[in-house]
């Protein structure tokens, strides 16, 4: 699963979709 990543979002465990 991916975490929600808007432009310039904070880094997440998984790659952004």
Curated annotation (Swiss-Prot):
The modification Cysteine amide is found at residue 17. Keywords: Amidation, Disulfide bond, Hydroxylation, Neurotoxin, Secreted, Toxin. GO terms for cellular component: extracellular region. The keyword Cytoplasm does not apply. Expressed by the venom duct. Disulfide bonds join 2-12, 3-17, 5-16. One of its GO terms (molecular function) is toxin activity. The modification 4-hydroxyproline is found at residues 4, 6. It comes from the Eukaryota. The keyword Disulfide bond applies. Its main location: secreted. It is found in: Secreted. Elicits excitatory activity in two subsets of the mouse dorsal root ganglion neurons; the medium diameter isolectin B4-expressing neurons and the small diameter CGRP-expressing neurons. Displays low inhibition of the human alpha-9-alpha-10 nAChR (IC(50)=10.2 uM). In vivo, intracranial injection into mice causes strong tremors and impaired locomotion for around 3 hours after administration. The cysteine framework is III (CC-C-C-CC). This peptide has a cysteine scaffold similar to the M superfamily of conotoxins, but it displays a disulfide pattern previously unknown in native cone snail peptides. This is Turripeptide ubi3a.
